[in-house]
Amino acid sequence: MESQRNILLIGLLFVSFLLWQQWQTDKNPQPVATESSVVASTVTDAHSADVPDADAALPEAVAASKELISVTTDQLTLKINPVGGDIVYSALVGHKLEQDKEEPFVLLQQTKDIYYISQSGLIGRNGIDSSTKGRAHFSSQSQAYTLADGQDTLEIPLTYVADNGVTYTKVFTLHRGKFDVGVEYRINNTSAEQLQVQMYGQIKHSIKKSESSMMMPTYRGAAFSTADTRYEKYSFEDMADKNLDKKTLGGWAAMLQHYFVSAWVPPANDQNTIFSSVSAGGLANIGFRGAVYDVAPGTQQTISAQFYVGPKDQEALSAISESLNLVVDYGFLWWLAIPIHWLLMFYQSFVGNWGVAIILITLTVRGMLYPLTKAQYTSMAKMRNLQPKLQDMKERFGDDRQKMGQAMMELYKKEKVNPMGGCLPILLQMPIFIALYWVLLESYELRHAPFMLWITDLSVQDPYYVLPLLMGVSMFLMQKMQPMAPTMDPMQQKMMQWMPVIFTVFFLWFPAGLVLYWLVGNLVAITQQKIIYAGLEKKGLK
């Protein structure tokens, strides 16, 4: 009994420490790059010197709305600047900015508060985009493109003819039901000169802190992948300290925020360079430089890459790049969070309600732990039967804790009681609790996911704090069903009496889905306790 209560307290402190540690990590990340892979940000990288700087492109990028090319599919609304062919606006059609409004969630944008765009171009000896030559001014056959009913693919061709007569066609390809955008350059070298070009793609983002809280930590910043490192965050602080410059086969570069991601994915079989920089104007850039292509006179060449702009949909991200789904970061318990997420999706596909799916997960976990729970309550019942003897020992030995401990161990051995027998179910629940916490925090499917009545979004805290209060009441009832051991010292008794209150206060700011899991778990535990105790009473254990 006493051990169980101590473990419960340790569990609370453990969870609190983990949440605080993760919050500190995301709010104050440490540089992770090594000297061999980066150069100081004050030094110009020779390989990226020709990539248009964020500040250099800024005046041209902020074009009037009537000059931008509009693209609409069933999933995306994009705006493309004909100067350079940059994607300067993206709205996610099926994702609302706020639950009670029809306004779509906007990811890429240019406003007074945030500058966040996707840029791509051709650099190199015959590149049409550079920091010195400026950007290519493309022409388009239309100012608006829409994916029509019955149409699965939409292409947006932009054309630029260089002074030497070479035609560069930049083609954006979008598909029904998808958030990825194919970006392809088709080069028709009608000149007598051999061309040498290199494609680049980069994401530019004004440095902005994530809107985190201790109970809802989120990450806003960059991330990348190479052949050696499948996934690594590279925060704005890292980018300001060091320029990233990693050569790799394949790879990708991304900007992350809560539930959403934008990412450039170059060809997996090409030798690419993942780079980053921070401009003097406060824009953070991360992207790739692709392989160098030679285009002989009278020939044509195609160079392409993929750009993703949308939710952190693990299936969609995995289809683009094997490791891109890792931007859904479940932390050190990812191995446990992944099956929990799968099971949550499985249940939801049947019941159609995320809250009910969480309840089913709770019942599943409690069912799996039932044999251990039964052993726990059996051990507790045996411990209760020993309370008179333990109380007698306390009176005999007084403050002599050493003799008291020795006598207790001898008694446990004689009566075949394991004082730690009630701890295992609690210890096993804590990793599940933490893993579910990160699933609720990271899985975009739970954003704006309703349950019932006043719970309209399981990914945020209960607006009226009803679930946390009910959870506190359930803990109080559980505590009343498990009388405190007489051997527990007064300080421990006071602490345990306050545990339901402490837990309730902590859970006020937890996502409603997580509180629902804990509340239902408590109710199931109370039911199991009554059933198990009824069986134990028949065996003479009370």
From Swiss-Prot:
Is Protein transport among the key words of this record? yes
Compartments annotated for it: namely: Cell inner membrane
Its assembly, as annotated, is: Interacts with the Sec translocase complex via SecD. Specifically interacts with transmembrane segments of nascent integral membrane proteins during membrane integration.
Q: Which keywords are on file for this protein?
A: Cell inner membrane, Cell membrane, Chaperone, Membrane, Protein transport, Transmembrane, Transmembrane helix, Transport
- Membrane topology according to the record: Multi-pass membrane protein
Query: Looking at the keywords, is Chaperone present?
Result: yes
Protein's job: Required for the insertion and/or proper folding and/or complex formation of integral membrane proteins into the membrane. Involved in integration of membrane proteins that insert both dependently and independently of the Sec translocase complex, as well as at least some lipoproteins. Aids folding of multispanning membrane proteins.
**GO BP terms:** protein insertion into membrane; protein transport
- Highest taxon of the source? Bacteria
**Gene giving rise to this polypeptide:** yidC
Per UniProt, what is one Pfam family of this protein?
YidC_periplas
Q: Name one GO molecular function term.
A: membrane insertase activity
Parts of the chain that traverse the membrane: 6-26, 326-346, 350-370, 421-441, 458-478, 501-521
Query: In its UniProt entry, what is this protein called?
Result: Membrane protein insertase YidC
Family of this protein: Belongs to the OXA1/ALB3/YidC family. Type 1 subfamily.
Cellular compartments per GO CC: plasma membrane
